[in-house]
Regions:
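Structured, solvent-exposed acidic/aromatic patches
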Residues: 40-44, 90-308, 312, 316
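Sec-dependent bacterial lipoprotein signal peptides
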Residues: 1-20
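N-terminal low-complexity segments that are often proline-rich with Ser/Thr-Pro
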Residues: 318-321
Length: 321
């Protein structure tokens, strides 16, 4: 009788083990959360990362972000390059006048420029790279490459050497590339991305349309944008390396799709990917009451009065006061 009871107990334990093994994953999966498999199937795994990269090229936010993205844009760009270029002037006197606009650089503002133009989008780029390799979707990684270069060329031009060719690798120390090496790598990466997206565009394909807040997945427009970016980089190095500059400028201009030539080609984020984005300059000018048109820009526009009409009120980018 004792042996019979032992066998029954053993059988019961085995049955319970089998039941537990069969139902463990199901019981421990949140029915209200997306699994990795579902994310890959629905495109969310890379789609969300694409949107995140787009929002990091030039920091932009929505109402849900409150004013965080606007503040990040202000200290990273508006109080430095935007003002130094003469496009904008400032109606505030931060740090008693000792700030970036007077060339007294604030370390935290400089750090914000590096973080927003380089660090922020690195994790999203790595995720897209990994997922596109798993799912064999090189066109999505091609888009990620274009977005990465859109942001990182600003870092390169602002800070000099940056980690580029080995960025994202699992190493304790990532080497910095010289400006020449980084620019050449960007041209190579852009060429590869353009080639991939050109094929998809000729097939009439769109990519991650629901998550693309710029062109809604229009591959032809992305190719034109990438060609324009290539032309811009070529012009940037024209005095340092005329031969390379001419090569890639011609390559961009001679591409069958060409470069951006009309307003419909404009790469801008106002609504898209199910979101409504805030205009940073509008907020800095009309909500913060701090950003104004720069005197240099105003002086240039005085030479053609109609320019003042088109650049001030209708777009609500800024007001002339």
């Amino acid at each position: 009788m004792k042996k019979i009871n032992q066998y029954k107990l053993l059988a019961g334990i085995c049955a319970l083990s089998l039941f537990t093994a069969c139902d463990f994953e199901e019981l421990n999966t949140n029915p209200f959360e997306m699994t990795d498999e579902m994310g890959i199937r629905d495109g969310v795994a890379v789609g969300g990362a694409v949107t995140a990269m787009q929002r990091a090229v030039v920091t932009v936010g929505t109402q849900a972000d409150d004013t965080d993205a606007i503040n990040q844009y202000q200290v990273a760009y508006n109080l430095s390059a935007d003002s130094w270029s003469g496009f904008f002037g400032q109606n505030n006197n931060w740090y008693s006048g000792s700030n970036n606009t007077t060339y007294y650089l604030q370390d935290n503002w400089v750090a914000a420029t590096y973080t927003n133009s380089y660090t922020t989008l690195l994790s999203s780029w790595k995720k897209i790279k990994q997922e596109s390799e798993k799912t064999e979707t090189p066109e999505i990684f091609a888009l990620a490459q274009i977005l990465k270069i859109s942001a990182w060329h600003k870092t390169l031009e602002s800070f000099g050497p940056i980690p580029y060719t080995h960025a994202g690798e699992p190493a304790l120390v990532i080497p910095f590339d010289s400006e020449q090496v980084a620019f050449n790598a960007m041209f190579t990466d852009l060429t590869a991305a353009i080639d991939i997206l050109t094929v998809r565009a000729e097939q009439g394909a769109t990519i991650v349309a629901d998550y693309d807040a710029v062109y809604a997945g229009d591959t032809r427009k992305w190719v034109k944008y990438a060609n324009s970016l290539m032309l811009r980089l070529a012009m940037r190095i024209s005095y340092a390396d005329e031969t390379t500059a001419q090569k890639y400028a011609r390559q961009a201009l001679n591409h069958p799709f060409g470069v951006m030539t009309s307003k419909s080609d404009e790469a801008q984020m106002s609504t898209g990917a199910g979101m409504v984005f805030r205009n940073n300059i509008d907020w800095l000018a009309n909500q913060y009451n701090e950003c104004r048109m720069g005197s240099s820009m105003f002086s240039y526009l005085l030479g053609y009065q109609l320019s003042l009409i088109h650049i001030s009120e209708p777009t609500r980018h800024l007001r002339i006061s």
